[in-house]
Amino acid sequence: LTLGRVSNLPTVWSNCLAASAINLCAHGWVRAIPDWKDLNALDPLLLLPLLLGASLLYMGGCTLNDAFDQKFDAQYNPERPIPSGGISPARVWTLGSAELGLGAWMLIDLAQCEPLWIGALVLGIILYDALHKKWSGGVMLMGGCRLLLWAGAATCGVSETIYPLTWIWGATLAFYVVGISLFARGEAKAKEEAPKLSIVFLFGPALVALAALIHWNNLDPIRVFLVNLVGLLIAWIAFDAILQMRGGKKGAIGSGVSRLLAGICVTDALVVSFCMPMLIAPLLCLNPLALWIQKRFAAT
């Protein structure tokens, strides 16, 4: 469970649910207001393998991350499972590869996701694991993996088309994830200020939602209220986490990053506020679940 970083699984589930929902409700052009649909628009027979398959891909990627990083961890993170002797490298390689393979099969065969996006996601995961310690731009691969997960989940079932609105929100999510890493990296270095662009990325979901409300100025009052409510929540999470990390207290950066990661669930709740309001509460509940699991298993 430590290898698989299970504390972040609620964010994977929320990504899958939100991507499926927005793509079901979106149209071929951005000007069109997304449809309002109920939860019965989501097929539970497809959602179960979607969530399980995505979970296995995420855990497989995290497991292989330890396999790729074993030399680095032996020097800098001796408490990790491999250098501490908790598990052998061969077993980690086998376990991670099996999780990736099984997860990809479930997504393609059972959840009926588009093979192109799932294959690209698997490739992206492996590239990130192999390069992130060697290349400072690896953070872009991390965001790219979230975008590819979003794209794959959007094609769950009979849908092969990914609509422009789905891509916009997927890119917003990807930049939010990039913003977490960039800001934390800057704050962790005493002589280096966090890039200002990272702050824009962290507030990206709220800003995109505000732009959408202006764009769809005839959106019904219920959805306008819900978007404003959830948008203020994710903006507050970003603002509070930034202040916490800049406070300089011991463990503040790790705590702030964990809160921002759990905030992915709130970002997804903001997305469905436009199209499937009944899904808001379940996605918001995944946020405290992620925070609770983080107390038992590290999120990073």
Which residues fall in each region the model found?
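Membrane-embedded alpha-helical segments that form the functional core of polytopic membrane enzymes
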Residues: 12-68, 76, 100-105, 113-128, ...
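Hydrophobic, aromatic-rich alpha-helical transmembrane segments
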Residues: 5, 9, 39-47, 51, ...
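Acidic (Asp/Glu-rich) catalytic motifs at the cytosolic membrane interface
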Residues: 53-87, 91, 180-193, 293, ...
